Amino acid sequence: MELVRELLRKIAEFENLTAEEMYNLMKEVAEGRATDAQIGALVMGTKMKGETPEEIEGAVKLFREKVVRVPVKDPEELVDVVGTGGDKSSTFNVSTVTGFVLAGAGVKVAKHGNRSVSSKSGSADFLEALGAKVELLPEKVARLIEEVGFGFMFAPLFHPAMKRVVSPRREVGVRSIFNLIGPLTNPAGVKRYLLGVFSKEYVDKFAKALKNLGVKKAFVVHGEGGIDEVSVEGETYVTEVSEEGIRSFTFSPEELGVKRKSLSEVRVNSPEESVKVALSVLRGEEGTPRDMVLLNASFGILVSERAGDIKEAFEMAKESIDSGKALEVLEKYVELSNKI
């Protein structure tokens, strides 16, 4: 209790915590030694102060230790396509559809997500609307990844340590450090990420945290239109993280021969509408939703290092859709998720 008070005092005085201090603070929270009032203070305090890469790193380390593991054979080759959410863009489920395209291109995808908080259709809502069963035990998720190339981990089942913070977070009702660490606590131990963030200021923070956490390769992106994805509307700010280091650049759709289109063409109002758009993309229909998926899938394939450059990755993404392989992955995933 005294440790919690001391570290909350530092946050209240706008002092940054070290990774170790944040790890220790989150340990107190996760193991039930912090009160609801203290958790609420942590939520509001970190929100007002602003989270540092070291604080994100420390929190992620703790919750990674507490996660229920998915027993995959080779976690270092898996990719997660995930966003922080909170961009209020109401786009269809681009990251999940991108996951099917990656799997169709031979990349094993371990998708980590939840039901909707801020969007019209969370990844779990979308998969359920497709007919998939999402609340699966770790061994079953591992089997799906191995046999189909795509598996989904429904976050609440894999993060029992997060239960302590649910009520205080809901009562305070602001975006906080807990929203930031979720995407980085993949239960399959993923080392490769295409990670979208809701604000440009967080791109480099996440990149530094990922580097310190030892990822093999990641792209952290924030797209024009304020979205946590590679944007078809305009430029996307990208930071690449690899074992060699960190570099940032701006990407434009024109680099892959894609014309800019309005994000209004990829917005939906429900999971069912998202399913309709997703199936049109995977069945080969031309248009803005397809372009949006191809841009994101290009970066996802590049993360897997199955392509030498973005143009090769783009061609692989097109082949995954146009050959019907991506749609086949979706159909097999839905079928097997209900059988196992």
From Swiss-Prot:
Pathway(s) annotated for this protein in UniProt: Amino-acid biosynthesis; L-tryptophan biosynthesis; L-tryptophan from chorismate: step 2/5
Details of cofactor binding: Binds 2 magnesium ions per monomer.
InterPro entries documented for this protein: Anthranilate_Pribosyl_Tfrase, Glycosyl_Trfase_fam3, Glycosyl_Trfase_fam3_N_dom, Glycosyl_Trfase_fam3_N_dom_sf, Nuc_phospho_transferase
Species, as recorded: Aquifex aeolicus (strain VF5)
The name this protein goes by in its record: Anthranilate phosphoribosyltransferase
Catalyzed chemical reaction(s): N-(5-phospho-beta-D-ribosyl)anthranilate + diphosphate = 5-phospho-alpha-D-ribose 1-diphosphate + anthranilate
GO biological process: L-tryptophan biosynthetic process
Keyword Zinc-finger: no
Residues at which anthranilate 1 binds: 83, 114
